[in-house]
From Swiss-Prot:
Pfam families, sorted: Ribosomal_S8
Organism per entry: Edwardsiella ictaluri (strain 93-146)
SUPFAM superfamilies, alphabetized: Ribosomal protein S8
Function: One of the primary rRNA binding proteins, it binds directly to 16S rRNA central domain where it helps coordinate assembly of the platform of the 30S subunit.
Matching InterPro entries: Ribosomal_uS8 (IPR000630), Ribosomal_uS8_CS (IPR047863), Ribosomal_uS8_sf (IPR035987)
Listed NCBIfam families: PRK00136.1
Top-level taxon in the UniProt lineage: Bacteria
GO biological process per UniProt: translation
Quaternary data: Part of the 30S ribosomal subunit. Contacts proteins S5 and S12.
Name of the protein in its database record: Small ribosomal subunit protein uS8
Gene Ontology molecular functions: rRNA binding; structural constituent of ribosome
PROSITE patterns on file: RIBOSOMAL_S8
Keywords per UniProt: Ribonucleoprotein, Ribosomal protein, RNA-binding, rRNA-binding
Keyword Phosphoprotein: no
Length: 130
């Protein structure tokens, strides 16, 4: 059986991995997943990530903890295959009054809501991370 929403699966693996105090989580890799992992690393939500394998690449995320508690408090899928959510540059949401981030897929690539606002771009709201 094929996976219906690979991005939701990625977010769930991160959520479950941190709930179980895992050091790292692995998942099948894709360009979008790598772009999301890059944004999470830049914003300090994960420690690091790497891609292994050639035929079927596997993405490994090294999770981040602060004083024994997970850095990611909540991670939530917004736009999903059955209901895509697009926002213009002035409609981009502020997550937890600016404490969290919205991961946005724009015409210039995957970035945070802040970066999209500065670049004057709108796009698909992939997920919220706080």
């Amino acid at each position: 059986m094929s996976m219906q929403d690979p991005i939701a699966d990625m977010l769930t693996r991160i959520r479950n991995g941190q709930a179980a105090n895992k050091v790292a989580v692995t998942m099948p890799s894709s360009k979008l997943k790598v772009a999301i992992a890059n944004v999470l690393k830049e914003e300090g939500f994960i420690e690091d990530f790497k891609i292994e394998g050639d035929a079927k690449p596997v993405l490994e995320l090294v999770l981040k903890y602060f004083q024994g508690k997970p850095v990611v408090e909540s991670i939530q899928r917004i736009s999903r295959p059955g209901l895509r959510i697009y926002k213009k540059k002035d409609e981009l949401p502020k997550v937890m009054a600016g404490l969290g981030i919205a991961v946005v897929s724009t015409s210039k690539g995957v970035m945070t809501d802040r970066a999209a606002r500065q670049a004057g771009l709108g796009g698909e709201i992939i997920c919220y991370v706080a």
